[in-house]
Regions:
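Basic, flexible Lys/Arg- and Gly-enriched helix-loop patches that mediate nucleic-acid binding at interfaces
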Residues: 2-237
């Protein structure tokens, strides 16, 4: 259940104050009858609401799931005092949503960032116990070696003493410095720390997929779209 003023704000882009004024002025109809009470409780999945005589367009979405192709120089956060955030890039289209990134990429990294307001799904994606695979395209400052591949497969322990879980590092194309990395559970700076064990530096890092959902290659850096129903179900499963 949801208050009428909150529902109207989310559906129209109004502020809560604007939606309350519209309701008290008799501009809003619920199930064909004028309603002037902003605190009226609705079943948001089945509500029949009209504003100024016109039914609200589209359907109500309890949560949204957005695939963003993160460009370099943007931070993976909901808000930041100095830098542009991934949420800033989509905010104009989702003004009343409290979005956050389900997982982070460094400021210099690029690729697939999932933005949502579904905390349960984000937890499932990020929880180490759930082992949601994430795939990356990495360029190193030195060629990939068999020692690195074996080390990734077994898991490594950097100088800080934290054991990093097994992952996969495989050649990606003809360039020996270009590597496809698959993480089965992610921790802070895992890829850079794992390659650091072999004195290999990461020049670029681009996330290609999350949980089997691949970045839409038609999205230019900074562009985004909502997940399809099939993609959303794939993440939830």
């Amino acid at each position: 259940m949801m208050r009428l003023d909150k529902y109207l704000a989310e559906r129209t882009g109004m502020t809560r104050s604007e939606s309350r004024k519209a309701i008290t002025k008799g501009r809003v109809m619920v199930a064909g009858k004028i309603c002037r009470k902003a605190d009226t409780q609705l079943d948001e999945t089945a509500a029949q609401i009209a504003l100024d005589g016109a039914p609200l367009a589209g359907e109500y979405k309890k949560y949204v799931y957005i695939m963003l192709n993160k460009p370099e120089g943007v931070v993976s956060a909901s808000r930041d005092k100095r830098d542009t955030t991934v949420v800033d890039l989509v905010a104009a289209d989702y003004p009343r949503r409290e979005l956050f990134p389900a997982g982070r990429l460094d400021k210099t990294s690029t690729g697939f960032v999932l933005l949502t307001d579904d905390g349960a799904l984000a937890h499932d994606i990020l929880a180490p116990a759930h082992h949601v695979d994430k795939q990356y395209l990495v360029t190193l400052d030195t060629p990939l070696t068999e020692e690195m591949r074996r080390g990734f497969a077994a898991g490594v322990t950097p100088a800080d003493g934290e054991h990093l879980a097994p992952a996969e590092a495989e050649p990606a194309g003809d360039d020996p410095c270009t590597v496809r990395v698959t993480l089965h559970q992610g921790v802070y700076h895992q890829i850079k720390r794992m390659f650091g064990v072999y004195d290999a530096g990461v020049n670029t890092l681009r996330r290609l997929s999350i949980g089997g959902v691949a970045l839409d290659e038609t999205l230019a850096p900074g562009e985004y779209r909502e997940l399809t129903e099939e993609e959303r179900k794939q993440l939830q499963n």
